[in-house]
A protein has these predicted regions:
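Central regulatory/effector-binding core of bacterial HTH transcription factors
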Residues: 87-129
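An alpha-beta-alpha
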Residues: 164-213, 306-320
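Periplasmic-binding protein-like
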Residues: 92, 116-124, 181-187, 231-243, ...
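Flexible loop/hinge segments that line or gate small-molecule binding clefts
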Residues: 123-162, 268-280
Length: 321
């Protein structure tokens, strides 16, 4: 018995998006070239779409959710909050991971915007804040970045990072730690504004200490960390707790003791950050509430932007022990 063809199969065979295939079956706009291709494969395979696929366009309780990575820890918290709010309001959510692809983000926004939906939530990438494509689009909420022309739920990064950097450096100075330099390690695919912000804050707070940046092409790949040579008496600020945790392994490989030879600080406060040895100093943001509020704002048609909250988590990795 042959397996029934799906929209995903059609999308894969033709090299077009699943949303394009969905628009074809729901009477939406599809280019003539793609329409001819889909016509041919539908007739050849006697394909008929299932009821769920055909009903998507007719539903008005759908919310699109777009993120660079659905599986990241912080994104998962935003999703949990969004789903909780959606369930309370009998709304349904459709998710799309862009893989940090600029074109994938644009295409997903266009396709969600074409549905009869409540709106779209976008976890901002560095493309989101530069892209004129978004000008004029309605019912879009950005999370993680402040963009004047749209509704945004943004984190108080300047206040949080200033507090984190200043507290860490002042504490080490009070403990008479032999701190000689500062380094910031980040993922090149992430928002560049955080990199610029932390570099400025470090220069203001510790102007006499040398500081440097190091970019990782992909912070999820273990091999990318092999280029990092940790130096004694350096403090390493990391763009995420995940990067910081990878540096723990590098420190062990290089026989450096965290809290004595070097100091490591993260951003994000993952579930297991306080379970590390030594426990990781970091800063926590209210990701769950951001997701929850984003859905509620779409439902209420509230386009006002708002700032989130943060909490410092000062632990052992930033102390001279």
């Amino acid at each position: 018995m042959t397996q029934k063809m799906t929209m995903a199969d059609i999308s894969k065979q033709l090299g077009i998006s699943k949303m394009t295939v969905s628009r074809y079956f729901n009477g939406g706009y599809v280019s003539e070239e793609n329409r001819i291709k889909i016509d041919a494969i539908v007739k050849e395979n006697h394909y008929t779409p299932n009821k769920f696929a055909r009903s998507i366009r007719s539903q008005s309780n759908i919310i699109g959710f777009i993120a660079p990575r659905i599986e990241s820890y912080t994104t998962s918290l935003v999703i949990k909050g969004a789903l909780a709010a959606a369930n309370e309001s009998n709304a349904r959510m459709l998710f799309h991971a862009t893989g940090f692809s600029h074109e994938s983000e644009r295409q997903a926004v266009s396709e969600f915007n074409g549905l009869n939906a409540l709106g779209t939530i976008v976890i901002a990438s560095k493309h989101s804040i530069e892209e004129p494509f978004y000008n004029g689009l309605q019912n879009i909420i950005f999370i993680g970045k402040q963009i004047p022309t749209h509704c945004c739920l943004y984190y108080p990064e300047q206040a949080a990072i200033t507090a984190l950097v200043s507290h860490t450096i002042y504490q080490l100075q009070q403990q008479q730690a032999p701190l000689t330099a500062i380094q910031y390690i980040y993922d090149a695919r992430m928002l560049s504004s955080r990199t610029q912000l932390i570099q400025s804050i470090i220069s203001d707070i510790a102007p006499t200490l040398p500081n440097a940046l190091q970019a990782l092409a992909d912070s999820e790949k273990k091999d990318d960390y092999q280029s990092i040579i940790l130096q004694p008496n350096h403090i390493y600020f990391c763009a995420t707790d995940n990067i910081a945790i990878r540096l723990y392994r590098r420190a062990k490989e290089q026989h450096l003791k965290i809290g004595h030879d070097i100091w490591i600080v993260g951003i994000g406060d993952y579930d297991y950050s306080d379970l590390l040895v030594p426990s990781l100093t970091t800063v926590a943001f209210n990701h769950y509430q951001m997701g929850y509020q984003a859905v509620k704002k779409l439902i209420k048609r509230d386009s006002s932007s708002c700032e989130g909250e943060f909490e410092l988590k000062i632990r052992e990795s930033s102390q001279f022990i």
